Amino acid sequence: MTSQVSSILSQISSPTDLKKFSLAELSLLAEQMRHKIISVLTNTGGHLASNLGIIELTIALHYVFSSTEDKFIFDVGHQAYPHKLLTGRNTEEFDRIRHDGGLSGFTSPSESIHDLFFSGHAGNALSLALGMAKATEDSRTHILPILGDAAFSCGLTLEALNNISSNLSKFIVVLNDNNMSISQNVGVMSKNLSRWIHHPKFNLFSRKIEKWLTKIPRYGNSISRRSHKLSICLKSLFCPIPIFEQFNLAYMGPVDGHDIKRLISVFQTARDLPFPVLIHVYTTKGKGLEIAQENPEKYHGVTANFNSSKENKFLPTIKPQLTYPDIFGQTVCTLGEAFPNLHIVTPAMSLGSRLEAFKEKFPNRFIDVGIAEGHAVTFSAGIAKAKSPVICSIYSTFLHRALDNVFHDVCLQGLPVILAIDRAGLAYGDGCSHHGIYDLSFLRAMPNMVICQPRSAVVFQQLLQSSLQWNMPVAIRYPNIAATQRDPIATDVHMHRDPGVGEILSQGEDVLILGLGHMCNTALSIKLQLLTHGISATVVDPVFVKPFDNNLFSILLMHHSKVIIIEEHSIRGGLASEFNDFLATYSFKVDVLHFGIPDAFFAHGDKESLLKRVGLDTESMVKRILTHFNFRTKTSPSNKLSIV
């Protein structure tokens, strides 16, 4: 990159600085921003392809509108990196985005006045924008929801579309269409519109008419602005009317999302229109990075130290340890062969949930419904009702959106839908909108629901296979971390498991430790550290949060009066809550120390520091255990350790 290019970005401290530059310089700025994002994400990881594709669009928005006076509402928010660079956040904090001391990977009001909402989930921007438009309808404020094409598959977006009033003014919907979702659906429409809108004779005619109208004394400018609505009506006589017009949105586009001059012109026109408008912008996801343009889904999100060079992309790399999603993807392929009518359903998360192999192997039994979590669950219920086994693969944080569907269409009907709840636990780099730490709270309350979590790869495979035979609603939750491969207790992947049966992993005398899922490893580590203090612990994997193994724990509590519970879930409504209900029901009097996620929102961070922040690191827990139970070590002459 040249020093000239570098100097442009360094001169941007706020969006108003954009006005200092020519169109040619703004194009150089886009190049610099692209280079900056690639360079930073090579070190930090993050959402790559979507941010590379929206740079020129973001520059044009900030050039025409004011993000402090007008309201920019980014749907999802993971495509806001260019927005951050233009709003005073081109700092060392940007260089550590998604990490300790760095910026959030999403819009965040705690960072900047230019960010209106904490974001992370898709489809809500239009509803939020309509609410703000209603509250500010008498002001000069422009409301600009910025949606990706995938957001238009969300039911929430369609509900919002149905509530748009033609009386709205200063309401501009920006549709960033990067060919990842609805493009095929509107392909014929877009081709007709594009052919008509960009026809030289029509554009020449339109310009002459508008120029003539502006010359009318007193009313010319007003009539000219309204002539745009007339031109849209004329186009509708010759080509299909865009669906957006049926929802009181005047359609403008398609517009090349990488042509800054054209974008600025279109936004300036839309700014002065007295009715709601949708601007359809075509962008290229991964723009400027060839490997990302060729495979935008793969490079939607990247890990730190990803290889951005196409020439070197086939260099050998160290193969990471298999994660729980990897185990899930492999296991469902095996189950797909054993169960010839097994269906897998996912709401737009096939790659993240490692379902590409199943999709390729069994294309007729793999269904990606798009960003429609509620539909995914209810669709799965329909498959189950038709007597076919079905697994609905869904992220914990997105399952929130399907709560009623789980209750009404699965549990109430008693249908054997298996919910494979991915990303259960802290989301680390993604932060508070993505932590999967609330699902137990609402799933526990639902009758007929079995809830379990594996501690190892073997137990995970056992649960997946066994659950297909339970004939009831099941939730199997698991994190996106390396799966424990060696399990001395569970060795046979084909062993059948019955609901509600826990396992003792290690015997002791002084304290009982329950670890949920992968936290069993932490519990065993704590046991070893407690041994150095002369404290002997029994470690148990309940496996099932519901039904809880009342028989096993009734026996264990006859010999233990001190209990420790460790879970990577909110302290409200998780394993500890189930255990406390058990204690109350059976009138056990024991001292319980609970380690979980405190009742607060936690921002992004590196794994070790975030675990320490919430009190789930081993060192912090051991200190608290020793203090809470007032453990002190004594060594008898026989070297036998006793606790007083």
Curated annotation (Swiss-Prot):
One Pfam family in the UniProt entry: Transket_pyr
- Protein's GO biological process: 1-deoxy-D-xylulose 5-phosphate biosynthetic process; isopentenyl diphosphate biosynthetic process, methylerythritol 4-phosphate pathway; terpenoid biosynthetic process; thiamine biosynthetic process
Tell me the domain of life: Bacteria
Q: Does the keyword Transferase apply?
A: yes
Reported cofactor(s): Mg(2+); thiamine diphosphate
The Gene Ontology CC terms held by the record are:
cytosol
Query: SUPFAM superfamilies per the record?
Result: Thiamin diphosphate-binding fold (THDP-binding), TK C-terminal domain-like
Protein family: Belongs to the transketolase family. DXPS subfamily.
Task: Provide the protein name.
Answer: 1-deoxy-D-xylulose-5-phosphate synthase
Q: Please report the organism this UniProt entry assigns to the protein.
A: Chlamydia caviae (strain ATCC VR-813 / DSM 19441 / 03DC25 / GPIC) (Chlamydophila caviae)
Lineage runs:
Bacteria, Pseudomonadati, Chlamydiota, Chlamydiia, Chlamydiales
Provide the gene name from the record.
dxs
